[in-house]
């Protein structure tokens, strides 16, 4: 394992009056994921993200889900972004850019990532009905209107540029999951060590 790979781990603890979060992340893992947020569909999405990014990821979140899942989902995305930024360190030797198209049945989603140090998020293409759709396989439902906020929180706190778009789709579950998986695959490419690059992949010399 190279020096670039050896240090690419992070542990983030984030505590507020609304949530208590511990995240452990290894960018050079094999997709071992263990997620408990109290929001079962969000667990499913973060498990997909970690698995398809080939990250080792442990998430433990206790939040005020008796009010609503929003705080738990948002705060976990903030902490995950912070963990990603911490694990990347000075970003030496990474590919920096990544993108992926992910189909899921009738849905097609695309994500593009630049590990630029300049946080930005563009999210587009979700059908209007996702503004009021609920995925409710448990007592703590996931409202798909939160999708954009998850990606924004991840990008802002990881300090990456993230573009996520839905080209087409119908089922809220498929649309949401395809986006998480597209982000995962794009991140996997972007943070991967580049054997031809030993320095920071920027003409500025810093990211």
Curated annotation (Swiss-Prot):
Name the domain of life this protein comes from.
Bacteria
Coiled coil regions, renumbered to chain: none
**EC number assigned by the record:** 4.2.1.19
Q: Which Pfam families match?
A: IGPD
Any one Gene Ontology biological process term? L-histidine biosynthetic process
Which Gene Ontology terms cover its molecular function? Answer: imidazoleglycerol-phosphate dehydratase activity
> Which InterPro entries does the protein's record reference?
IGPD_sf, ImidazoleglycerolP_deHydtase, ImidazoleglycerP_deHydtase_CS, Ribosomal_Su5_D2-typ_SF
As for subcellular location, the record says:
Cytoplasm
User: Its catalytic activity?
Assistant: D-erythro-1-(imidazol-4-yl)glycerol 3-phosphate = 3-(imidazol-4-yl)-2-oxopropyl phosphate + H2O
Enzyme superclass (EC) = lyase
Assigned keywords, A-Z: Amino-acid biosynthesis, Cytoplasm, Histidine biosynthesis, Lyase
Q: Where is the signal peptide?
A: none
Pathway assigned to this chain's UniProt record:
Amino-acid biosynthesis; L-histidine biosynthesis; L-histidine from 5-phospho-alpha-D-ribose 1-diphosphate: step 6/9
The family database entries (PROSITE patterns) matched by this protein are listed as: IGP_DEHYDRATASE_1, IGP_DEHYDRATASE_2
Assigned GO CC terms: cytoplasm
Similarity comment text for this entry:
Belongs to the imidazoleglycerol-phosphate dehydratase family.
Q: What is this protein called?
A: Imidazoleglycerol-phosphate dehydratase
Q: Which organism is it from?
A: Mycolicibacterium paratuberculosis (strain ATCC BAA-968 / K-10) (Mycobacterium paratuberculosis)
């Amino acid at each position: 394992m190279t020096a670039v790979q050896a240090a690419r781990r992070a542990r983030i603890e984030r505590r507020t009056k609304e949530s208590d979060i511990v995240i452990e992340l290894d960018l050079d893992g094999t997709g071992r994921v263990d997620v408990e947020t109290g929001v079962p569909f969000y667990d499913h999405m973060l498990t997909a993200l970690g698995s398809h990014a080939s990250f080792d990821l442990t998430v433990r979140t206790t939040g005020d889900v008796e009010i609503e899942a929003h705080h738990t989902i948002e705060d976990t995305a903030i902490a995950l972004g912070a963990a990603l930024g911490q694990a990347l360190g000075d970003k030496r030797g990474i590919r920096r850019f990544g993108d992926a198209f992910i189909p899921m049945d009738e849905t097609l989603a695309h994500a593009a990532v630049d590990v630029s140090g300049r946080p930005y998020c563009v999210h587009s293409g979700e059908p209007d009905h996702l503004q009021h759709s609920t995925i409710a396989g448990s007592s703590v439902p996931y409202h798909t209107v939160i999708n954009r906020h998850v990606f924004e929180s991840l990008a802002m706190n990881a300090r990456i540029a993230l573009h996520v778009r839905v080209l087409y789709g119908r089922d809220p579950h498929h649309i949401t999951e395809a986006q998480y998986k597209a982000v995962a695959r794009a991140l996997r490419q972007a943070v991967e060590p580049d054997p031809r690059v030993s320095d920071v992949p920027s003409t500025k010399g810093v990211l």
